[in-house]
C-alpha cells in the first residue's frame, strides 16, 4: 500500500492533474481499509507536501509580494480550518464512505471542467481590488480547500485577475501559498480531533515523498514538454468521465 501511494501521488502531481489531493481522497475513501477521516488526513498530507514542494520550486515565501503574503497567510489558514471543521461535522453524522464520495464527486466534476476552460482574460472594476476584496477571496478559497480538499488554487487563479495591482498582489506563488496555508490549518485540525486510524510511518513518508517529487518534476516540465501538457489535458478529460461515472454510481445506488 505504501508503494501504491507513492506512485499514485507522484504521477497525479507530475502529469498535472488539477486536483490530485481530491482524487487521492476519493480513492482512499473508496477503499475499505481507510475510514473517511483517515482519507482526509492522508490526502491532506499529500496536498501539503506536493504544493509545498511546488512553492519551494517557485521561490518559496519570498516569491510572493510582502503585502499580499501578510494578508493571505492568516485568512487562508483560518479559512482552511473552518472548511475542515465543517467537513468533519458532516462526516461525524454519517457512517461509511458513501456520503463522503457523494459529497466529493460534484466538486471533482466542477474542478475538472474549470481546468479545461481558458484562463480568465477580463478585469474586474478597479475599486473591487482593494485589500478587503483580496482577504475575502483568500478566505473563501481557503474554506473551499479545507472542505473539499482542493480547488482553492484553481478558484484563486480563475477569479483574481493578474493585471490589476500586479506589484502588490500578483505572483505565480500566491495560489500555492494559499493552498499550503489552508491545508496546514485543515490538517492540524484533523490531527487534533484524531484520524481514527494509526498510520505506519512508512505509508505517510511514501505519500509525502511521492507528492513532493511529482510536484517538483512538474515544475521542471512547466516551461517545456508539450507531450506532458497534452497528457495532462487528456487525463483531465478522462477524469471528467470518471467524475460523471462516480456521480451516477453515488446518486443512483
Over which residues does each language-model region extend?
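A generic alpha-helix surface/boundary motif
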Residues: 22-26, 154-155
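Short hydrophobic/aromatic, small-residue-rich stretches within specific transmembrane helices
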Residues: 43-47, 175-179, 203-204, 208
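Gly/Ser-rich catalytic serine loop of serine hydrolases
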Residues: 17-20, 152
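Juxtamembrane transmembrane-helix boundary motif
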Residues: 1-18, 25-37, 56-146, 162, ...
Amino acid at each position: 500500500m505504501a508503494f501504491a501511494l507513492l506512485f499514485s501521488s507522484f504521477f497525479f502531481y507530475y502529469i498535472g492533474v488539477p486536483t490530485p489531493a481530491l482524487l487521492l481522497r476519493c480513492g482512499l475513501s473508496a477503499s475499505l481499509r481507510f475510514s473517511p477521516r483517515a482519507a482526509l488526513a492522508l490526502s491532506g498530507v499529500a496536498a501539503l507536501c506536493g504544493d509545498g514542494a511546488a512553492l519551494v520550486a517557485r521561490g518559496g515565501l519570498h516569491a510572493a509580494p510582502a503585502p499580499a503574503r501578510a494578508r493571505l497567510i492568516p485568512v487562508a489558514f483560518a479559512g482552511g480550518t473552518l472548511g475542515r471543521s465543517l467537513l468533519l461535522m458532516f462526516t461525524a453524522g454519517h457512517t461509511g464512505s458513501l456520503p463522503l464520495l457523494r459529497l466529493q464527486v460534484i466538486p471533482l466534476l466542477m474542478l475538472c471542467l474549470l481546468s479545461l476552460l481558458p484562463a480568465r482574460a477580463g478585469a474586474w472594476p478597479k475599486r473591487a481590488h482593494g485589500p478587503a476584496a483580496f482577504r475575502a477571496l483568500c478566505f473563501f478559497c481557503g474554506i473551499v480547500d479545507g472542505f473539499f480538499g482542493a480547488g482553492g488554487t484553481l478558484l484563486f487563479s480563475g477569479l483574481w485577475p493578474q493585471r490589476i495591482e500586479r506589484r502588490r498582489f500578483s505572483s505565480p506563488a500566491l495560489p500555492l501559498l494559499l493552498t499550503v496555508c489552508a491545508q496546514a490549518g485543515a490538517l492540524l485540525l484533523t490531527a487534533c480531533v484524531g484520524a481514527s486510524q494509526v498510520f505506519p510511518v512508512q505509508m505517510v513518508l511514501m505519500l509525502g515523498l511521492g507528492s513532493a517529487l511529482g510536484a517538483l518534476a512538474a515544475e521542471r516540465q512547466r516551461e517545456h514538454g508539450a507531450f506532458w501538457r497534452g497528457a495532462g489535458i487528456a487525463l483531465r478529460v478522462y477524469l471528467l468521465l470518471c467524475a460523471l461515472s462516480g456521480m451516477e454510481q453515488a446518486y443512483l445506488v
